[in-house]
Amino acid sequence: MAEFTPMMQQYLQTKEEYKDCILFYRLGDFYEMFFEDAELVSKELELTLTGKNCGMEERAPMCGIPYHAVEGYLNKLVANGHKVAICEQVEDPKLAKGLVRREVIRIVTPGTNLDMQALDESKNNYIMCIVYLADRYGVSIADVSTGDYYVTEVDSERKLFDEITKFSPSEIICNESFYMSGVDIEDLRHRLKITIYALETWYFGDELAETTLLTHFKVKSLEALGLADYDCGMIAAGALLKYLYETQKNDLNNISVIHPYSTGKYMIIDSSTRRNLELVETLREKQKRGSLLWVLDKTKTAMGARLLRSYVEQPLIDKAEIEKRQDAICELNQHVITREELREYLNPIYDLERLITRVTYLTANPRDLIAFRSSIAMLPPIKSLLGDFQCELLGEIREDMDTLEELCALIDRAIMEEPPISVRDGGLIKDGYNEDVDKYRKAKTEGKTWLAELEAKEREKTGIKNLKIKYNKVFGYYLEVTNSYKDLVPDYFMRKQTLANAERYITPELKELEDMILGAEDKLVTLEYDLFCEVRSTIAAEVVRIQRTAKAVAGLDVFVSLALVADQNNYCRPKINENGIIDIKGGRHPVVEKMINNDMFIDNDTYLDNGNHRISIITGPNMAGKSTYMRQTALIVLAQLGSYVPAASAKIGIVDRIFTRVGASDDLASGQSTFMVEMNEVANILRNATSNSLLILDEIGRGTSTYDGLSIAWAVVEHISNPKLLGAKTLFATHYHELTELEGKLNNVNNYCVAVKEKGDDIVFLRKIVKGGADKSYGIQVAKLAGVPDSVIARAKEIVEELSANDITEVARNISVDTGSKKKKEKLDEVDLTQMSLFDTVRDDDIIEELRNVDVGNLTPIEALNKLYELQNKVKNRW
């Protein structure tokens, strides 16, 4: 690199170490990028691409960003999936001998961004590490901004995707084996918007992982961390920690606890079900408004909002834990005044979790400390109010909550009420906190007064009436005495300069004043910065206490929110059972009732059990409310996260997982048709559901022909109803009225329909679920409601009358039920299983016969094309 300038050589050496990053290289007041980085950044950020002399004949492509505006540009690059290495000047350019020393102080990636402006305060920003070894997946998840750190293991790709969907990380790092395992990496990148990298093999050595973990958490064995049974997970946790060390360039003190967890502790909700039930965002707009979380979230703090989201995404399956949460909600609603006082005290609390991370990273500014102080000032009254409650969970929250009064007092004494953002501009430390600060501050403001006082004192003391204190840049401050008073100059005056008509002197006292006055500004700024850093370090040393307190505040915020929602919306406390009974009286959909006038929502009952009410077949027209009814039952996730539920009363049998098959759409990205997507989801449900699961199946089989669809739907119901094969509790909505014939043939299947009132050709949807099967689909009436032209409606009525002669219900009545035996079924020879065409009454029999007689094997390609063209013209001309 001899041809490059010294500065460019330094840049290229640094870039060589961080090849996979965009290098932000600090030059004075700018971060500059060169060569490929400059071209990429100028394009993505729409910056002007210029050139810089680098020692070669051609100028190096270059673009720059002002250092004071870097966050906005940086966040945009990171949001686009880039890694950015920040290379700072690590010595004062004024003191540098030769080239200023520079070092990369941090690497910012999508999963490690700490900028509060870039992060959604109500959502964690997770980074996930996946290790694939011996058909198992080790999974470790961290939120660097809050210090959360989790680890688990799963044994299938589907379970892995459930974890990915649950945590929704913005970045995944993995070993090469996972990258090459056949997992759809592009799907992760593009559909789920996740940045994913495969790291070098050495990151995933088990010895390195173990050493990294034991050293960081200061323990002597994996047992102490709860990782003894997590061989694969331990490697993932160690590799992730190593990666964070390398990107964050600090000791990661905010990651103080690791949480191993078993996926069996929570209800399993796969990605399809999460989307269909709209737990945290709506299916189409991807917005919070309209989701279950939107209804429940009355939290006052960012920490509470994040914790509530995790509760919604991870419902419990342990009865005691669920009831423990219910007890907290119950008691909060028994003390409404105290509950509202708690909300008032929670309201001013800032994001303590992310604030303490900034403190431990030494990036917290003075205003962050003021926000921290105003937050922890709320803790003593909150803890005092919690003393009024008796339930176990609120007692645990009170126990975990530290009032942190000494930290509040420290900040109160030390930091100005309205300090600047910058730590280098002074104005940080309060008067009275430090003697030297007070002295320098006084020198800065009262220096002229001190000089005038000294001048008067020396004039009186010496009798030199024209003695003056003056200043120049060469000598600083000095005493000037004219020659006429030279004889009165005392011995302690030290001559500095002789002029034609006067002498210039200094004294020890004047020199001391000079040092204080001239250096006061710089010394004050430096001292204030040092004192601020001391205060910040004192707070950082208490990170474990602060994080535990933050979690307690978040938990309180969640339960106060759930209590308020239950109170305002007339929710009831569900009785949790382990015998499989789901008995909901007057159930309502929590979201729909909020989106419309509450008085307009029609409530409904639901009863399912492990005996004769295992499956409910629900029939009725579109728009009648079948899907809303089924989804509101599925939202028993509310009960298992510990919340009250929208119903008059509810008994909820714990379910281990919920599956939904709702709606239909092509998966164009993977080349799958609507029907293939549907069948993939059905296959997943039948293979992974258990007898303790809840299934919500809407219109199984509608993506194919009538007979095929009916046959599949029928067989699916038979499979689910058989306790030896599955036996899961199921709500099964269908347009195939023929499935109502299963009631009576299968002793655990029951028919329900949506009540409809007919007024001539018009219909009124009553939105009420009643016993029995629907005998009509009312499709034409729904089409009329939708505004389909009258001519089309009239023609549809004619066609449906003709088609009704081909009723397949009679066929369904004669189908034998699969009981699981090996006995051969009777053939239904009299049934034509050909797809029933909409226009069976006007078949083109001659064209079909001609097509049947074509000898395809002996046609040339051009003859085949001509024959196809001929047949097509016949069809066109006929219609």
Annotate each PLM feature.
Residues 204-212, 219, 267-271, 283, ...:
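Amphipathic heptad-repeat alpha-helical coiled-coil/stalk segments that mediate oligomerization
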Residues 87, 110-119, 251, 389-393, ...:
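Active-site phosphate-binding and catalytic loops of NTP-dependent enzymes
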Residues 164, 169-177, 183-186, 198, ...:
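Conserved catalytic alpha/beta cores of large enzymes that bind or transform nucleotide phosphates
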Residues 1-331, 347-360, 364-456, 820-829, ...:
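Charged catalytic and DNA/RNA-contacting regions of genome-maintenance
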Residues 361, 365, 375-378, 431-432, ...:
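Charged, surface-exposed helical/loop "interaction arms" that form contiguous linear patches used
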Residues 35-38, 230, 300-301, 311, ...:
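ATPase nucleotide-binding head domains, primarily ABC-like/P-loop NTPase cores
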Residues 837-879:
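C-terminal tails and terminal domains of large nucleic-acid-associated
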Residues 322, 329, 339-345, 372, ...:
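Amphipathic alpha-helical coiled-coil segments
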